């Protein structure tokens, strides 16, 4: 069912964070994600790419409202098993000229569901068919962006920067 939520970009109440999220800090969040490295490889996705996207879309500790309230770690739009939630989000019309829209994002029952849906999407959907063929994480993030995963012109560069900043290549 579609429900209206608050602004995706508002700060999260720390009390809500403690009651809704097991992963309360960056190390715990990275540990959660790195636990899916084998599954990422099985879908042709570099673990560093998966982790960088989760950090960019959810914050370095998974504390975005979308992650907290919808367990959506990757900013995935649309419906998941009939579940979705409407959020305010920013889109890039080109040249990093952002505008605010309301859009429907997938709602999950667990972080596991979010991660596995993300991997299935990138590993099997036709528009992402080139993504698993990438030889390097850098090539893979470029292909993900090129396939239309995000409108942000700087999406590829942001993901590469996160992989370097958090030393995510070690998980590959």
Language-model region placement:
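Catalytic cores of secreted/periplasmic lytic hydrolases that degrade extracellular macromolecules
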Residues: 1-172
